[in-house]
Amino acid sequence: MEAAQSPCLRVSVSPRPHSPNYNSLCMSWSTVRVPASSANLGPGFDALGMALGVYLDCRFRPSRRLSIAATGRDRAAISTAADNLIWQTALSVAADVRMKLPPIDLVIDNQIPIGKGLGSSAAALTAGVVIADRLLGLGWRPPRILDEAARLEGHPDNVAACVLGSIVASAIDSGGVVRAVRLELPARFGIALVVPDFELPTVEARAVLPSCYSREDAVFNVQRAALLIAALAAGSTTAFPAALEDRFHQPYRIPLVPGLADILLLRAPGLLGCALSGAGPSILVFYESGYEAVCDLVRQIFQLHGHSAEVLLTHIAERGFEVGQVPGPPAGAAFPEGIDA
């Protein structure tokens, strides 16, 4: 879903007697790569998430002082101070398990557009949980990492895609445990993103939604969500135009995204359908062929409403987060002198 652009978590960490001996840790750089994600996919409000082949890459290692460097897309929007979301997430995990986290050197190479409905904060939260898991030696498996990331995010749809990859249907059961099922997809359609030149804060996008829905609208969305999951699993593209219809969130967000009404009604050769990505304003485009022409139509609609837009050709990321190691520091990383954490 819509990844909340909330302030970074702020916690204090009390060490416990059996924290790891960080002097014995290997000082080579560890890595974590997390995919972007698109939530909702039309009718699957707060339930469906898709991992995308656009990534947040982090390198990290224990250090004497906290140092954070940011490169890549929207780097000016990424804090390199102690309130960095990735670092604060790692601290929150450490506090939760009552262990002490060492300061780290952290290099963030981001390619995910920030504030555009593409799961940038979910990727950061997932990276923070993974970093804490590695540094503290917790040995968490993906389901535990997903539970922790969903607890911090407040909903599981984006982080489920970040952790598991592909397209994921998820829910939180009555005991607070995330239940998620990953779909294995036949590759019979393409994915592209049209990213306009403005941001849409999640809190604003959620504020326009009603507090309750009619039975008619609820049945409408349940039918479409079921149809979409079946179409995705079977590789049946003929159902896409109907399966992407929605009455839960997109109609209410039309005033916030200039051109959205026309984009959702767009029909063209090779186009399977469009959906608002998460809370928006980016548009997720499903196509069979001719993505350039299809995406150009979406871009032209934004232009008619006074906004430029960028087309990103991408794909469904089959893998969720991945971890590894590299022998030396990343080239060209410029660190501040140190941060008082």
Region roles according to the model:
Residues K100-R179:
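Gly/Ser-rich oxyanion-binding loop with an adjacent helix/lid
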Residues A192-P255:
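Active-site rim beta-loop-alpha module in soluble metabolic enzymes
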Residues L232-A341:
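Glycine-rich, charge-dense phosphate/pyrophosphate-binding loop(s)
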Residues N23-K116, V130, R134, L138-P142, ...:
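ATP-binding N-lobe of GHMP and related small-molecule kinases
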Residues P7-V11, P15-S19:
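Intrinsically disordered, low-complexity proline-rich regions
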Residues D46-G49, A150-A160, V178-E184, I229, ...:
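A generic local secondary-structure boundary/capping motif
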Residues P62, I172, P196, V285-S289:
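Short beta-strand-to-loop capping motifs
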